[in-house]
Structure formats: C-alpha cells, structure tokens
Amino acid sequence: MARIGFEELDFQITPMGEISLRRRHDPHLGVEVFEVKLNDEYLMSSLFTVAEEELATLGLAAVSGDALDVLVGGLGLGCTAVTALADARVRSLTVVDALGEVVGWHERRLLPVSNTLLDDERTRLVVDDFFDLARRERADDAPRFHAILVDIDHTPTHRLDSTHADFYTADGLRALARHLHPGGVFALWSDDPPEAE
C-alpha cells in the first residue's frame, strides 16, 4: 500500500500550541487535501467541509431581510466565511480569528478559498479573540450584526482552550446577544448533536 505523503505549508508556535497547515494529494479521490493540526490533534480537513458550509447556509437562512452584516468567529480553512459570501444578501463579512498565523495563511493565499475571501470587498479579516470580543460591552458606535456564526471549539464541552467555557453559559450568550441586531441569529457549529432540553 502506497503511503500518502504531505507537504507542510506552514508551522508556527502559538499561545494555543503548535499549529500547522498541511497539503497532500489523495490519489483515491484525485484531490488536494488541506489539513490543520493543533499540537497532535487534527482540527479540520478540506475533505469534510459540509458542516462548516451548512453553518453559514442554515444560519443565514434564518435571517430575514437584505444588506446583512455577518460576523464569523473562527477562520480556519475559510469554508464558513466563503459560504456566507455566496449569499447575495450579505453586505459585510467580518471574520475574527485569535491566531494571526491562520489569518496569515489566507493573506499569503495558501488555501483554495483565500482568493475568494480576499478579493471580495465585503470581507474583513480580524485578528482578535472572538470570545473576548463576545464578552466586551458593545460601544455605542460599534457595529451590530444580523448573524453571528461560530465555528471554533469542537463542542461546548470539548474546547480548544479552557478560557472559552464561560461563552457557553446563559450569561455568555446574553453578552453575545448585545452584538446582534434585534431579531438577529446566532448559529454554532458543534461536533456533538444538540443536548436534550
């Protein structure tokens, strides 16, 4: 059996640990596969993007109106962000990622969707801690969003960092709601099914 090799496109030490972006060719599928690893854990793969795309599709489908301002928490491979841009109602897309290294991958156009993101004037990539942003009091002149789409942690209980825990509480979600327009939508990607009420 032939071994499938990979090319490491980037490797960085971050406050969250070692992060790497890898590319490999899958001979069985005939496609280039992009993967992100944090320490020894696979975070994402371009082979499995349906859930990230559906986060944007379903989240925006729940929003009425036009000229939508959208915030995406977590950039990663860019699948959620690019899917949001496909909705013609999106006026602006702000994508927040805590790791400048991840934003840098797109600025260096290392990923297949990087050109789509960067060449669209509606897109703004921001290096910031999404969870800290969600906790902040909203200044009077700060923007509100019609939709906030979050794909950062694996699940509300399997988090990339322990400091994210308070976001997944009633108080954390109330704080986030300050950043939404009235009637706005918050959508969350999780690797687990919804919990029983």
Segments from the language model and where they lie:
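N-terminal auxiliary segments of SAM/dcSAM-dependent transferases
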Residues: M1-F34
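Class I SAM-dependent methyltransferase Rossmann-like catalytic core
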Residues: G17-I19, R23-R24, V36-A67
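Short, surface-exposed beta-strand-loop junctions and turns on beta-sheet-rich folds
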Residues: P27-H28, Y42-L43, D140
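Short, basic/glycine-rich phosphate-binding loops at helix/coil junctions
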Residues: G30-N39, D153-T155
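The AdoMet/dcAdoMet-binding core of the Class I SAM-like
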Residues: T49-W189, P193-A196
